[in-house]
Amino acid sequence: MPILEQVGAREILDSRGNPTVEVEVALTDGTFARAAVPSGASTGEHEAVELRDGDARYGGKGVTKAVNAVLDEIAPAIIGESADDQRLIDQALLDLDGTPDKSRLGANAILGVSLAVAKAAADSAGLALFRYLGGPNAHILPVPMMNILNGGAHADTGVDVQEFMVAPIGAPSFKESLRWGTEVYHSLKSVLKKQGLSTGLGDEGGFAPDVAGTRAALDLISTAIEATGLKLGADVALALDVAATEFYSAADGYSFEKEKRTAEQMGAFYAELLDAYPLVSIEDPLSEDDWDGWVALTTAIGDRVQLVGDDLFVTNPERLEEGIERGAANALLVKVNQIGTLTETLDAVTLAHSSGYKTMMSHRSGETEDTTIADLAVAVGSGQIKTGAPARSERVAKYNQLLRIEETLGDAARFAGDLAFPRFSIEPAN
């Protein structure tokens, strides 16, 4: 039985130059593991709370309080416990914090410990993390949802939609899907250059040109796909993360593309997009608390496209359960730092899958070289992963880990492909 012997933590930098928490654990059998915690640019109101210092250092974004929480409170509480009892460890962390939103110790402190313990336990057992968490049947490689054009909170442009993604659903393997997506990414750069548009990068490695709006961005990407010789729709489909909470207010509704719109008008806009483009997924099309709008939208177009709840659900089993009961959305975005422990993350995924909801594993805009989510995507069989463009090493690290996993699985590996999107029809309605 592997026993926790040492727990340490430090302040490191994420991909946006902001401090974050890194945790290291050592077991009595000599096993050592570390985990680093990501953070988001557009965060949901209902997410677990990151503990920041709020002082002069790093503009108030330092995390020494969270680091000290690990060293002074968490470490003494879990040293001597068995590392292979993840649920027990995570429950001990929740009990120690004692708040519903993890605001006392900080979700960044708690998650770092939770993930580091899991990685150490896997290594102690002689198993890859995906195998340790997913068991002997974990073998599905996810479709990479590659954010190749950035807007919203991820870029300093006038484009309201936060992410424009390509999904290489027609590829025969993850390795080929990565190649296809990467070739489209480079093709898009050429298309942008030819049109005199910026090829500067946003937070997640995608290009951040200042284009006229959603349709203009989708047209650029469609052109880039076709320029590679791949088929738009059959080979490479499109997806959006609207992040609608970012442009919603109770007073004005949705301030989108220089117009004030209602939830119904936003729904009509999405229906038009579905008629015109091969969209497989739309994330956060409405605000995080617009439950009635979500239900109406799901009823209207949920049989045609994946509707993903990110800010709506914040990887929280309780909010997900409410959404399932109401009939809001049909997929869950999974971000481990939104909820703050591995156990709660796995519980949310289990609830989603048992209720017929799809899941998409996701990074954050402030990332590190940690590759846990790549293993987690395979472990839970999500069939989809969102971890940015094929650029910037903190994004590529996850893709490279998935290449290793596919190679490890050998003939047992299966690429999710278009089966990850059962609601999608290759040909647009009109």
Curated annotation (Swiss-Prot):
Cofactor: Mg(2+)
Active-site residues annotated for this sequence: 204 (proton donor), 335 (proton acceptor)
Biological-process GO terms, alphabetical: glycolytic process
Gene3D superfamilies: Enolase-like C-terminal domain (3.20.20.120), Enolase-like, N-terminal domain (3.30.390.10)
Keyword list, A-Z: Cytoplasm, Glycolysis, Lyase, Magnesium, Metal-binding, Secreted
Protein name per Swiss-Prot or TrEMBL: Enolase
Recorded family membership: Belongs to the enolase family.
Role, per record: Catalyzes the reversible conversion of 2-phosphoglycerate (2-PG) into phosphoenolpyruvate (PEP). It is essential for the degradation of carbohydrates via glycolysis.
Compartment annotation: Cytoplasm; Secreted; Cell surface
Cofactor details (free text): Binds a second Mg(2+) ion via substrate during catalysis.
Record Pfam families: Enolase_C (PF00113), Enolase_N (PF03952)
Annotated Mg(2+) binding sites: 241, 283, 310
Entry GO MF terms: magnesium ion binding; phosphopyruvate hydratase activity
Catalytic activity: (2R)-2-phosphoglycerate = phosphoenolpyruvate + H2O
